Amino acid sequence: MAAEGEQRATSDVTKALARHLNCLNDENKMIRRRALAAIQKEAADEKLASAVLQHVFLELLKPLLRCLSDPMEKCRELSIQIIVYCVSHVPRPEEALPYLMPALTQRLGQQQLVELSEELRLAMVELLTLLVEVCGKKLAPYLDEMIQIFQRTMVDPFPDVKKESCKCASNYATCIPEHFHMQAESLIKPLMQTISHQHSKVRVAVIQTTGTVIQYSSGKSVDDVLSHLAQRLFDDSVQVRQAVTVVVGDWLLKLQDRYSFFHKLIPLLLSSTTDEIPEIRKLALDYWEKIGSQWEKENEEDLKDKLDFSAPCPSYYPAGVQRPGLGCRELIFRNLSKILPAISRDVTNWVAGTRIKSSQLLAVLLLHGEDHITQHMELLLSTLYHSCLDEENQVVINSVKSAELIGTFVNPEVFLKLILSALQKSPLASHLMTLAACIRGCSREMLKTHLTKITSVISQSDVCQGSERVLYQEQLLCCIQSLIDVCQQDCTEVSLQCMNVLITILASPASESLHKKVQDTLLSLSEVQGLNGPHDLYRQHMQQLLDWVSQSHNHWTSYSVEQRQFEVIATESGPVMGETLHLFVPILKMCLQPTREPQMRLKLFTMLSKLLLKASETVNSQGQLHRYSESFINDMIVPNLKWQAGRTAGAIRTVAVSCLWVLLQSETLSQQEILQVEDNLMPRVITTLEEDSKMCRLMSCCIITALLSTCERQLRPDKLNKIYPELLKRLDDASDEVRVAAAKTLYQWFKCITDEYERTTYKGHLEFLYRGLLVHLDDPDASLQLIVLDLLKEGSAVCPSLLVQEIEAVRHKHRSPAYCDQLLHYIQKYTSPTPTECT
């Protein structure tokens, strides 16, 4: 009875639809549209039983499929809607497949776009997704048609069509895995064409579908997609990177032939463990732990010994880092030789992002590889030598981290042999950077037996003087800092070699930016030895340091590193220099001979001048400088006061005069010691009054004043007569400062006149001097006039009558006789005839 009822209902519906079906062939598009709308209304009648709808659908199917090619878009849309409704409501939708699949293939699977409407193409792909859902395995015979459609829709211009196609393909692969693998590779090309689409949601869909397609394929296409997936690890979209992580993680867990792809897939997953997003890092680590555990269980027999006698986590393991499980470590051990060459290439890739990712991955691999990385040391070190100099700071940071891990896991005997050998052959900043990082990663116990070897190499002149670039010097300093930080008081045995390196760094032109760091390192070196500071270090090694730099002092030039090292030792050792003058002075004496290079002498005199300015804190810290005063003056300063042509020679004379002036000012020399050198010194200083340098002339006046003051009443008349003419000339100097200084020196000169200076015999000298001074009593500079007035008052006591005679001779020539009258009044009032009055 039920069957008869269904037949009657089917017959009634068919009769009701007959007229509408006929109208579908009408030329008028509006009639066709109304007919389809009516059919849709009838088909969607909720009173229809599913069995009745099944019969009606099969009756309607062919006319509806013809309508898929209708010129009117609305008609095509209604047709698709009716088919979708029927497919989702009939009990046996698979019966429509023989007609439906060819029609969909014709509309979607052609080389050229047949359906021009994006929305309708999307609707048809959604219909296809529905068919996969309701028909399942019944779609297996239509594998070729489905693949043909996917190949076109995955590269469709409309993003939504791409996404829906990916969804449909994933579902289809899951439904018929036993058949899908035969055609799976056909989808790789369209998927890879779409994987870099501008919409992130499309990229996510493509990646997810690629994962499913490969999962249900023969695995031959893994190599074809790896490079594309690797690129997506650099994607700006978090969702895209997350999708790659999930896909690769699933492959490593579930892919049928996954063992043969471990060395290719593991780097992709481990790259995600260093992602900037915490969620992705956690996701990747969770996958990695599962993969390691699964592999461990699958290979339990091979790992039996390691599982039963597992070694505890090494005590020197990096702080704050959790040790990976045995399975994870073993996976890396066994695949490291295949992974490292590729990583090494990528670390030097021209794309910055690739270099950063690769350097991050290298550190992760080394953490897993532990002592197994020893066999790959040459490749690892050559890679780090390049990456340590990368222009990207993040690459450098990651490379240094990798080098520290090498120091942690590899025996120092191994890495030192390779690094030190490379350093000796070609000293580069990258070699030093790698060495410093390896040292930091190493344990004190392991490293202490190699201290001498390390410091003997880096203190060699070819290495510590290998480059004057800041980066090189900075890494040289890092090596010493690392040794001190790791080995602490063990550094006592190599303290001298460390000092040699640090002094060389300070002697470098690049040292200005590193000076504070070097001083801090010297302080650390002294502290680990229980000393009170850098000065104690210099005190401990001064003999060896000066022997070290002075080996070639006979051949020093201004470009000699040893000369700069000598300067550093002299200026940085502070009071220790005063304790070792017996070593310091002979070197300085040899290097300041007039036959030596002028530029070098200039540098050394400048250094000496600075030391003498703080004599009590440096060269005279022990109060012993006076013992060497004669050598300083006669052997170093005086020979360099001799006139020679050239600007450099002039500069040397100026700085030599400066040293002499500072030495005299320091009050380290007694009167007796000054008298011993005065005979040799005074004539040389007088010649410097003619120097082009105002400063030199000024200091020369000051020096002569000091010498006259010290030797007061002990200078013979003939010496005095050689001094005043040059001073008188300086009263006409271009510099007012020099004129004033010369006048003050003449004031001191008059004080040196004793009864031994016979006025009658030397009357001509006094006349010449008085006349010259009287000229300047009428000087345009009022301040100088006053100074000369005081000077003549002092000098009037020598021969008053002669001075009165000279004043009266020029009084009428002066612009104002006031000063002459004042001077005459002074002479009449305060002076008395001398025992040897001029006649």
UniProtKB/Swiss-Prot annotation:
UniProt keyword list = Cilium biogenesis/degradation, Cytoplasm, Repeat
Q: Which domain of life is it from?
A: Eukaryota
What are the disulfide bonds? none
- Which Gene Ontology molecular function entries are recorded, alphabetically? dynein intermediate chain binding
Q: Which PROSITE patterns match?
A: HEAT_REPEAT
What Gene3D superfamilies does this protein map onto? Leucine-rich Repeat Variant
Gene Ontology process terms (BP): cilium movement; inner dynein arm assembly; outer dynein arm assembly
* Key word Glycosyltransferase present: no
Compartments where found: Cytoplasm; Dynein axonemal particle
Q: What is its main location?
A: cytoplasm
By its UniProt entry, which InterPro entries does this protein fall under? ARM-like, ARM-type_fold, DAAF5, HEAT, HEAT_DAAF5, HEAT_type_2
Its GO CC terms? cytoplasm; dynein axonemal particle
Q: Does the keyword Kinase apply?
A: no
HEAT repeat positions:
10-48, 54-92, 94-137, 140-178, 181-219, 221-257, 259-297, 578-617, 675-713, 717-755, 723-761
Pfam families (alphabetical): HEAT (PF02985), HEAT_DAAF5 (PF24573)
Q: Which family does it belong to?
A: Belongs to the DNAAF5 family.
Q: How does it assemble?
A: Interacts with DNAI2; probably involved in outer arm dynein assembly.
Biological role stated in the UniProt entry: Cytoplasmic protein involved in the delivery of the dynein machinery to the motile cilium. It is required for the assembly of the axonemal dynein inner and outer arms, two structures attached to the peripheral outer doublet A microtubule of the axoneme, that play a crucial role in cilium motility.
Q: Could you identify this protein by its name?
A: Dynein axonemal assembly factor 5
This protein's species is Xenopus laevis (African clawed frog)
Give the gene symbol: dnaaf5
